[in-house]
Every structure is written in C-alpha cells, then in structure tokens.
C-alpha cells in the first residue's frame, strides 16, 4: 500500500534522489519503514544543517524523543556506553545513554538546547567531556553497512546523510498524530505535503544503494 500512496512522489529511485536534494538544501525528509515492521514515519534531518525551527517542529509534531543517529566510531569517540548490555527491544534499537551538551545549554529541554547537544555530539573534534550524561537527547548507534545490514530508521538516516555528502550524523523523531497515536503512511504523506518534505521508504533506499553498488562494482 505504501508504494501506491507514494507514487505521486516519483519512482522509488526518484524519491531517494529528491530526498538527497532536499537534505542538501537544508530541508528535512520523511522516512517510512515497512508496513510489517514498525510502520512509522520519521522526520529526518542532517545534524550539521538542522535549525532550531526544525528541531522545534520535530518536538511539536513528533514523539518528543529526539534521537541523534551516530556510527559505532563516533560512539567510541564520545565514549558513550550502550543503554543496556542485553538489548531485548523488539527491533534491537541501539540506544546509548542519553546526552546533554556540557556547555551552552540551560535545562537541556528546549529546541535550542537540544540542537546545541546534537551539534556538540556531531562536531569533528568532539570529545567525551563535551557531553554530560544523562540528558534530553537520545543517541542511536547505526549498524555498519546501513540499510543493507538493518532496515531501520537509524541506518536510513545515516545512509541519507552520507549519500547527501554530509558527515554520518543525523537527527530523527517519529511523527505522531495530534491525538498522540503514531502517524502511518497516509498521515505521513499529508504532513510531508504541508511541510514541503519529500517522502521515501527504507525499501526505496535499499534499492538505491544496491543499484549504486552494482554501478560501482
């Protein structure tokens, strides 16, 4: 059903291209996963271009759980322990301990403060002491290999940032409806049109990456 709903956004490969163009222009994109998986739409932004307004929109229209997606290398660089040793969550979502910027924030909750935290975590020369633990931003560690290894929003966000030419750090937040329920594909499409955001699926991104690797090979 998702593919039919999304046909107005172009073919699967066109949807990825449009998403990459939007990210390069400093906009956000909506990423849907499989209807048989979480069946959720996440707002995704590149960490290094995200604005306070975009963070505020994520908090206002999202679940409130703002996540910064990072690689294993960056997790080690920041010395962030995983939230639990034995991950029993359904999709093995790889949360680390939560973080707060050590400088430049007040309570850490506002959109500006959360963006400051994201920027501190994304800085090239970021070090463990730049972040306090716990905090109000939730790092997620992506699997090496991206969506070709794990078809999750975390990996999709890192892949999109990288393919768009940015460092592999991205911000995501699940879109929710006004009544607090999770937004599914029809609501995601409506929201995306209202906010001029492209929509793509993780399936689209897998197809795009496989095509790119085939061309490279």
Curated annotation (Swiss-Prot):
Binding sites annotated in the UniProt record for Mg(2+) 2: 38, 153
Free-text comment on the cofactor: Binds 2 divalent metal cations per subunit. Magnesium or manganese.
Pathway involvement of the protein, from the record: Cofactor biosynthesis; riboflavin biosynthesis; 2-hydroxy-3-oxobutyl phosphate from D-ribulose 5-phosphate: step 1/1
UniProt xrefs under Pfam families: DHBP_synthase (PF00926)
Residues the record marks as site: Essential for catalytic activity: 136, 174
Record flagged with keyword Hydrolase: no
Annotated binding of Mg(2+) 1, by residue: 38
Keywords: Lyase, Magnesium, Manganese, Metal-binding, Riboflavin biosynthesis
The enzyme's E.C. designation: 4.1.99.12
Any Gene Ontology biological process: riboflavin biosynthetic process
Catalysed reactions, semicolon-separated: D-ribulose 5-phosphate = (2S)-2-hydroxy-3-oxobutyl phosphate + formate + H(+)
Chain residues that bind D-ribulose 5-phosphate: 37-38, 42, 150-154, 174
Swiss-Prot/TrEMBL cofactor(s): Mg(2+); Mn(2+)
Keyword Nucleus: no
Gene Ontology cellular-component terms listed: cytosol
Subunit structure and binding partners: Homodimer.
Protein purpose: Catalyzes the conversion of D-ribulose 5-phosphate to formate and 3,4-dihydroxy-2-butanone 4-phosphate.
Family: Belongs to the DHBP synthase family.
Descriptive protein name: 3,4-dihydroxy-2-butanone 4-phosphate synthase
Organism: Proteus mirabilis (strain HI4320)
Name of encoding gene: ribB
